[in-house]
Curated annotation (Swiss-Prot):
This is Protein-export membrane protein SecG. Keywords: Cell membrane, Membrane, Protein transport, Translocation, Transmembrane, Transmembrane helix, Transport. Belongs to the SecG family. GO terms for biological process: protein secretion. NCBIfam families: secG. InterPro entries: SecG (IPR004692).
Length: 102
């Protein structure tokens, strides 16, 4: 009994060819990083000063209320965290793309 196995030829690609990413993807993530950076700066500047920091030295601490945070402040906190996480993820992806292109 003769065992005959015909396999399809295996084509090996170089790892650099399979990992290269087009410049449009890098440009897209770079633009997203700029947008997230500007949005994050705006959101951080919209927060009220909590006191005890640099905002206290320049008069920002006098405006903070004694009561709890309002719904708008809590939503601003949540939006800031989400934009911050998106900013961080964008930086990580850009770093991996730059490493893959080298």
């Amino acid at each position: 009994m003769v065992a005959c196995c015909h396999r399809a030829p295996v084509v090996h690609r170089r790892s650099s060819e399979s990992e290269e990413v087009g410049p449009a993807v890098v440009l897209g993530f770079s633009i997203a990083l700029i947008v997230f950076s500007l949005l994050l700066m705006l959101l951080v500047l919209m927060h009220k000063g909590k006191g005890g920091g640099l905002s206290d030295m320049f008069g920002g601490g006098m405006q903070s209320s004694v009561g709890g945070s309002s719904v708008a402040e809590r939503n601003l906190d949540r939006i800031t965290v989400v934009v911050g996480l998106a900013w961080f993820a964008c930086i990580m992806v850009l770093g991996l793309l730059m490493k893959a292109n080298n």
